[in-house]
Structures are given as C-alpha cells and as structure tokens.
C-alpha cells in the first residue's frame, strides 16, 4: 500500500456561512492529529499527516459538504482504525455527518469485499436472472421445532432464502446448536419436495469464539448462508468472520446502524460491501422506518455499482413491506434485488405456504 496516498472523506456539516471555513479546518485537524497545530512541530507531520480541507460547497443555507483528505498512513487496511480515522471523534459532534469516502485502490484490494457476491448467490439458487425472495423466522420465544415448521412452510411456498430474525440468537428457548440442525433438516425436506434449491441463513452472533463455533455447526449442516449484524459484532469481527466463512454467502443486517450519523448508502451499501457482505438488508421507504426513496436508491446503487474490482453486493429491501408492493419494489430496484417479506407473510397463519407461493409467483412473473 502506498502510504503517500490520501483518503478523501466527505462530511456534511451544519454551520453558519461565516463559520464554515474554520469549522472545516477544525474537522480536518480533529480527524488527523487531534491537537492544536502549534503543538505539531515536525514539518513532515504538518505536510503529510495533518488533514487537508480540499473543498467546501453549500447544500443548504446552513449546511455544507466538506471534503477532507487524510493520509493513508494513518489508516491501515483494518476496519476499526479506518472508521476511527474517518469519523472517530467527530462522530461525537452533533453537527457532522459522515457522507462518503473515496479510497485508494489498495484498500478494496486489501479488504477483499464480497467473496461470492450477487452472481454467487444466484448460482447457489439456480436463479440467474429473476429477482430473489426472502423471509424471516419469528417471533422470538418459539422453540427450534416451531421455527423449523415455519421454515418448512415458507420453503414449500418457494421462498429463496429464509433467515433467522435478527432477534433470534443463542437463547435458552432456541439454542443455536438445536435450532440450526432442526431448520436445516426442514429446509432439506422442503427442497426435496419442490425439487429446487432454497437456502437458510442462521444468525451468527456473540463473541468471536462463539461465532466460530457457530460457523462449524453451519458447515456441518451443509448450509450456504450466514447472517451477521456488523455494527453489533464489530466491524473488525464481521470482516474476519466474512473471510473465514469460505464458500458461504454473508448476509449483513443493519441493526444499530442508525445509531451513528453515517449516511446509510455509505455504511450499509459501501462499507459493508467493502468488508465482505454479499448481500445487505436495509429498510425500504414507506415501511415502518424513515428512509426516503433517495436514500434507498443511493444505497442500492452503492451496493451494486462498479467499485474498483469488488464484486457487487445484493440489495435486500425489507422492513414492513407487503405483497401488494411487489410491482412497485421491482420497478424501483430492478431484478438484481432480493425482496424480504417477513411479518406480513407470517400473519397469514395457516395460509402461510399459500401466501408465500403468491409472493414468489408474483416476483417470478415480473417482466414476463
């Protein structure tokens, strides 16, 4: 890695026009040497390490886009230190949002990005072109066999990928070591009935040792997908597990991602992809979360667009969407997408398989 290269970071800053130049300089210092320039006596540090304000542009009466360049030498290709340099102390300042980052080519090469990406997931499902479907096992409190029964019925309806709800972990009522084999068995039975591939994504969580033990169970059961919550397990642990999950699709869940003032398209679309997410879940607008259409489009674009040599990451809109929005969703995202419908399917009760079949049929018919 060329340590003379610089990382370009874009922030959005709330400030009065007369104050923005000074505020931008303070931001550049905070995210680099973090001390008064009078304390920086070595000229090389002043020339190379101190952050530089590269551009300031208004985006509102009292809001500005500020581009700062940081020395790549301060941020080795390690998730924690990279994010620390991008937004560490400044994340505590309420007037600043981390909007985007432009990395030198050595960073994507070092982090690696998705191992399988969209094409890898499509290959596992035998679905080369159409949009994909997903659902979730819930609620918390169900025993392993009850969750397995839900998975079986969803799979009989043809749902491509069935994941644990993010609230289901390694709890007493549904221990990972009991739940995963039960659901995997139910999925195998449903796949045999339908003569098609459908996938189960267990939620891998806990300490690094816990997650490694859980990965062993996933492999033993012959599963192809895991789900992790990067902001809960830690970005460094997420990246490490994504690398160790050789041959597995890695699905990233956005839990806790709203606690930071980081633009969703950057965090869920770009950074999760950089660290190894093959697919990224996020709330679609109009559901029970407050994302806008512009945010959702930017996020999906960040996940899928050409970016260095990284494989694209599949957008997975979710969050309170229902079958009656399928046409709208596919018109918005196109076919390189997985629509994740959970609660509104499960509410069908005894008609769960029939509703799942309607969901998958409507998605499959799009564009025909």
From Swiss-Prot:
Unknown. Probably does not have RuBisCO activity. This is Ribulose bisphosphate carboxylase-like protein 1. One of its GO terms (molecular function) is ribulose-bisphosphate carboxylase activity. It comes from Rhodopseudomonas palustris (strain ATCC BAA-98 / CGA009). SUPFAM superfamilies: RuBisCo, C-terminal domain (SSF51649), RuBisCO, large subunit, small (N-terminal) domain (SSF54966). Pfam families: RuBisCO_large. Belongs to the RuBisCO large chain family. Type IV subfamily. GO terms for biological process: carbon fixation.
